[in-house]
Amino acid sequence: MAKEKYDRSKPHVNIGTIGHVDHGKTTLTAAITTVLARRLPSAVNTPKDYASIDAAPEERERGITINTAHVEYETEKRHYAHIDAPGHADYVKNMITGAAQMDGAILVVASTDGPMPQTREHILLSRQVGVKHLIVFMNKVDLVDDEELLELVEMEIRDLLSEYDFPGDDIPVIQGSALKALEGDSKYEDIIMDLMNTVDEYIPEPERDTDKPLLLPVEDVFSITGRGTVASGRIDRGVVRVNDEVEIVGLKEESQKAVVTGVEMFRKQLDEGIAGDNVGVLLRGIQRDEIERGQVLAAPGSIKPHTKFKGEVYILTKEEGGRHTPFFNNYRPQFYFRTTDVTGSIELPAGTEMVMPGDNVTIDVELIHPIAVEKGTTFSIREGGRTVGSGIVTEIEA
């Protein structure tokens, strides 16, 4: 059966839900798809229930979301790919790969709790990975009788956003109940429509880097019998077309060339994938074990694998979930680039004996495996599964 072509008539925007565990991110995602299906029925707008978004079996048993669920829906103005980013601290790694795919995000805060530790962590992560536009959805307002309490929670959220260099005073805050909307209460359905209008207006259409050379961080790899190997991920910049030659860069000293024989998005064939699209790219002549998560597909010659660079980093404070103690020269954490962790050692500037939580510092890094990096590439510093710093590459050294 021939696959139907993907419709590009509406601008495409990547958004997602972030926030503390059990504050209602997945319920809100379900409510958005369900209310849009009721109010703006279309081929794209189909209701998704909580269980289908929270799909993997081990997730539901623990009542927490581990994987990153992708759903699609549309408003009158736009087509959205929506990521339900996991809330639990153990799954921050997935949050980082998920948040890296958002043009904007809806921060879900339960009005009954107010901001919690992971609310803070997700705001920080959003700032780190370059999610510039946040909208707040204060959930569960039906459970709070006191108007003053709601005002207090809103002020607290705005202060927290400002603390992390978001425009806390200007960010839209929508108060509603995802569960009530999901259950069909028209007052709360109206609020979901209001939320989507706000997303349409407040999250700008992203400036896509379509004129730059292709860069596609590989998130997943699988093989299709008889057709070859597929690498999937979100195109960071540039365009990928059928018959293009691409280079597989990173984790190995030598880059490898391949030819693209197919591009698809949401299981539909495309002539080309452009920056911002989540695509699967079929590669001719590449074995399943010759490409892996953490590598990138790039325009030939546009980016090289490196092991040594200078970076400007911010080390998180204990309150932000970072280290409680300083680190010294030759500290060896993991460096998280795009979709993967690589161990590296840190050399401190001459005269700097140690780095305290909360410090900014320029460091020299040497990775144990080469990674496709360039000036301006961002990374997180992690140890034992938690983020302890964030940084940006300022200079390539080798």
Swiss-Prot record:
Mg(2+) binds at T26. It is an enzyme of class 3 (hydrolase). It catalyses: GTP + H2O = GDP + phosphate + H(+). InterPro entries: EF-Tu_GTP-bd, EF-Tu_GTPase, EFTu-like_2, EFTU_2, G_TR_CS, P-loop_NTPase, Small_GTP-bd, T_Tr_GTP-bd_dom. Residues 177-179 are annotated as: G5. Gene3D superfamilies: P-loop containing nucleotide triphosphate hydrolases, Translation factors. It holds the Pfam family GTP_EFTU. Residues 63-67 are annotated as: G2. GO terms for molecular function: GTP binding; GTPase activity; translation elongation factor activity. GO terms for cellular component: cytosol. GTP binds at residues 19-26, 84-88, 139-142. Keywords: Cytoplasm, Elongation factor, GTP-binding, Hydrolase, Magnesium, Metal-binding, Nucleotide-binding, Protein biosynthesis. It is found in: Cytoplasm. Residues 19-26 are annotated as: G1. Its EC number is 3.6.5.3. GTP hydrolase that promotes the GTP-dependent binding of aminoacyl-tRNA to the A-site of ribosomes during protein biosynthesis. This is Elongation factor Tu. It comes from Streptococcus thermophilus (strain ATCC BAA-250 / LMG 18311). The lineage of its organism: Bacteria, Bacillati, Bacillota, Bacilli, Lactobacillales.
